[in-house]
Amino acid sequence: MNTGTLVMLHGMTGTSEKMQSLADSLAPSGWKVICPQAEIEHPTRGGYAWWLRAEDPTLPLRKESQQQVLDSMQRVIRDIPDGPVIIGGFSQGGAIASALLETELHERIVGLVLIGTKTVRPDKLAESLPFLKPREIVWMHGRRDHLVTFEVAIEHAEIFESAGWPVTRLEHEKGHMVNLNQLDELKSSIQRMANSI
């Protein structure tokens, strides 16, 4: 059996420790798990962030925030061991995971896990996908998410679908969270990704 690494990235104000138990429960049989931690301390709410922003989360990122995204992407790449990778995350972590398709790491990514997230670089993502081999994505989002609205989040899934990538959509009626009622479906999707190599 081929093995690899499941990489799961926490959201804003999260920590690698908070992501670890979810990641462990989702890991394909025989796969390693790593949960890198962002390096930017959140100035008011505790925990860590992959980038900071003061303005409306539906607006494009300012130049400083865009640089923080790029720096965070490189920091995550440094932590990832050799071999196949399934990469995902919650909220900001999912946005970083998706953006990693725009890097040299894309050759080793066998699947994406996008939970309660959106793309922070929609144009870059849409430009890069036609040049990449499609791979499976599992996308989870709540219709009552007040931080990343469902309408904004669906754009992320649709960018992949428009490029012919297979997306398993796990929609739920809850808010900005991992829906534990769909954990088995999430785990099955991730195992399929691992089985594809």
Task: Place the predicted regions along the sequence by residue.
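C-terminal catalytic histidine-bearing segment of alpha/beta-hydrolase fold enzymes
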Residues: 151-157, 161-197
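Active-site glycine-rich loops that stabilize anionic/oxyanionic intermediates
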Residues: 11-14, 118, 143
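Gly/Ala-rich beta-loop-alpha elbow adjacent to hydrolase catalytic centers
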Residues: 89-93, 97
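Serine-hydrolase catalytic machinery in alpha/beta-hydrolase-like enzymes
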Residues: 3-82
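A conserved short beta-strand
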Residues: 107-119
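Flexible "cap/lid" loop of the alpha/beta hydrolase fold
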Residues: 45-51, 117-137
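Short beta-strand/loop motif that positions the catalytic acidic residue
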Residues: 138-141, 145
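Short beta-strand immediately N-terminal to the catalytic nucleophile in serine-hydrolase-like folds
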Residues: 87-89, 115
